[in-house]
């Protein structure tokens, strides 16, 4: 109860020093008294945010904005509060105002991250990249930056740029399996040429010989594109020994056996795959079974 009374007294005191007829003061003409008021309400707002009293924090920060309408830090904190209150559009407006209020090249990394996430969630890819560029100007280029660029370009549908973002990072760390797998995924999705695709499979397996997903995909592609069926069977065999009930691996192994005219054994593995498959993965297995006479 005492907390509520204190808050009411605070607001009454605030209205007493801010007459309703007054215009918003300009930051250049802030008096010492107004500066003291600003600091008081600012720290009260910060405490309210810490205590998750966001509605109260919003009121206090609005009064801070009344005193300093172009204060970037206040606008940023208002954006955080609006987010916490579930007001996405208002939060975006506050963050963008905070960005514009600060001299070029001085926006905080936290503000840039907030704007980048908002732009990415709204498919505003150019704006998101601009924010990442500014982040990189403040911090050392790293895996997080490369990953962000890869994600933006991939979701934007710019596959070549996504691969370029990955390759740029791999120049710094050529053995990073995460980025090698990202690159492989893009090559698989875009139907890359066999030579380039197989080189990537081999590169990953040199670093991680027991990567079951890569072994499975490599084996399936090799078997279905005129490659060495025995080598495909060998790689696929590793996957089902490691995960004997994995329907995807069983399906691949069964289909490779079928391509080698071992249909009875192929049916055994395909039926086992179907038995272990969830509904979403059954269609391809059924097609393979129906193809075997």
Annotate each PLM feature.
Residues 17-73, 84, 89, 93, ...:
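N-terminal leader/linker segments that initiate helical-solenoid repeat arrays
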Residues 46, 80, 117, 151, ...:
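Residue-level recognition of tetratricopeptide repeat
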Residues 50-51, 84-85, 117-122, 155-156, ...:
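Register position in tetratricopeptide repeats
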Residues 77, 111-114, 148, 182, ...:
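Canonical tetratricopeptide repeat
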């Amino acid at each position: 109860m005492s907390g509520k009374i204190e808050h009411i007294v605070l607001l009454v005191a605030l209205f007493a020093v801010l007459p309703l007829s007054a215009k918003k003061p300009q930051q250049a003409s802030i008096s010492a008294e107004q500066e003291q008021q600003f600091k008081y309400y600012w720290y009260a707002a910060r405490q309210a945010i810490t205590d998750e009293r966001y509605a109260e924090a919003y009121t206090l920060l609005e009064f801070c904005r009344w005193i300093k309408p172009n204060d970037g830090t206040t606008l940023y904190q208002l954006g955080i509060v609006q987010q916490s209150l579930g007001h996405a559009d208002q939060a975006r407006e506050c963050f963008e105002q905070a960005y514009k209020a600060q001299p070029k090249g001085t926006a905080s990394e936290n503000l840039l991250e907030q704007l980048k996430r908002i732009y990415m969630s709204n498919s505003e890819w150019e704006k998101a990249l601009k924010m990442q560029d500014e982040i990189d100007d403040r911090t050392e280029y790293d895996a997080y930056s490369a990953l962000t660029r890869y994600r933006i370009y991939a979701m934007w549908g710019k596959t070549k740029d996504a691969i370029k973002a990955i390759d740029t990072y791999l120049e710094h760390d050529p053995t990073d399996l995460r980025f090698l797998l990202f690159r492989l995924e893009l090559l698989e999705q875009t139907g890359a040429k066999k030579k380039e695709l197989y080189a990537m499979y081999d590169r990953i397996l040199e670093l991680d010989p027991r990567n079951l997903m890569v072994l499975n995909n490599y084996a399936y592609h090799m078997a279905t594109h005129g490659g060495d069926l025995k080598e495909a069977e060998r790689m696929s065999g590793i996957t089902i020994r490691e995960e004997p009930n994995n329907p995807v691996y069983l399906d691949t192994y069964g289909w490779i056996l079928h391509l080698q005219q071992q249909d009875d054994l192929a049916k055994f593995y395909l039926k086992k795959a179907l038995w272990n498959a969830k509904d979403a993965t059954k269609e391809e297995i059924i097609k393979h079974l129906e193809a075997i006479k």
